[in-house]
Amino acid sequence: MKKLFFLLIFFGYLSAEINWSDPNECKLPDHSIFVNKIISNMTLEQKVGQIIMPEINSITPEEAKIFSLGTILNGGGGYPNQIKNSSIQDWKNLSKSYYEASPEVNGIKIPILWGTDAVHGHNNVIGATIFPHNIALGATRNEKLIKKIGGAVAKEVSSTGIVWTFAPTIAVPQNDLWGRTYEGYSENPDLVTQLGKNFILGLQGEGEDFLAKDFVLATAKHFLGDGGTKDGIDQGDTIVDEITLKNVHGMPYYAAIDSCAITIMASFNSWNGLKAHGNEYLLTDVLKNQMEFDGLIVGDWNGHGQVDGCEDNNCPEAFNSGVDIFMVPQDWEALYWNTLDQVKEGIISVERLDDAVSRILSVKKHLGLFDGRVPHNYDQNYVGDSSHKLLARQAVRESLVLLKNENMLPMNPNKNFLIIGEQSKNIENQMGGWTITWQGKTWEGTENYK
């Protein structure tokens, strides 16, 4: 009987509800009257178009206009017209084409919002400044430097007619076997919290500069537990109790939200067997309700298709769980029609659809897209700016780590040092992933790295 009593206490503890509540300290203008007026005049077709995000090489501006699409992206290795060596003007021209294809509701243009993975510089663009990856920036422990880097990246992204980046990654890697460990600042949640917060402030600006001309929309990612998967398996299962999930992997998101991050990306991984894209408890109950996140949740690359019972072109479960935008690179048209049918059939409620569209339009309003901000009209070119290169050099210097000091430091500037090893002259591997292509590899050699 005594054993049974202790077992009941133990399992009762495991099942106890964890309180994630925390006031959102980000105080932004309330645009609900403006947004609700637009939504009240939208058709179901226009609303569904807002929640679909295709990749630029699978949709034309003309198609985007027909389907009233709200967002697009270029993935790692995605370029205008599939031309890797596209010029800055090529990027801006494509941005203009999509902008001009934006849907209108009662004479109000709802600009298409373009997102990109500018994770260590504007890394898909030839000539952009490349900064060290987060694992190196974490070694600097320099919050002011991280904030400056965020500001530099924002200017380079803006220079190509884009105003949204899917960064920073605020994962808290717990197993170095994870192939994306290099995208995290540290295994220490406190350090990840501080550096992630400052990168967001650098990207978006703050105070009167919040999302002003030289700043872009940040995305905190990936929610939640991407750095804690069993055996470090990418997109695997994070098997931890809820207290650990909150205090380790969730900690950086509190600071991100308080710093006015208004887009968060859902994660590929599962938590205790349930895919994050289909986890209503985490996305809606925890993130949107308890943590008071009032921005939008964007899915990851076909992440919804990994939810049980779903496919890339069909997943009401993810949307009902709290994902506001489907990132669906290729199968966007089939997903559009399936989702529209599901709304008409009541599988997805109109109230849930309106909530998602409201979040999307509010973000666009905060970004100034309804108030004269035209991304492709950005009139300066900061791509590869000399001051940014100096900043990148500073980041490299401050991030270097000597693993074993046998009277090596301080280094004598009058001596010569031999750098050996295959990677010493492999610029591609030194740059790492997310550089020109997703895996950081070119197919023509290293002429693109200077």
State where each predicted segment sits.
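Glycoside hydrolase catalytic-domain context in secreted enzymes
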Residues: 16-450
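Sec-dependent N-terminal signal peptides
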Residues: 3-12
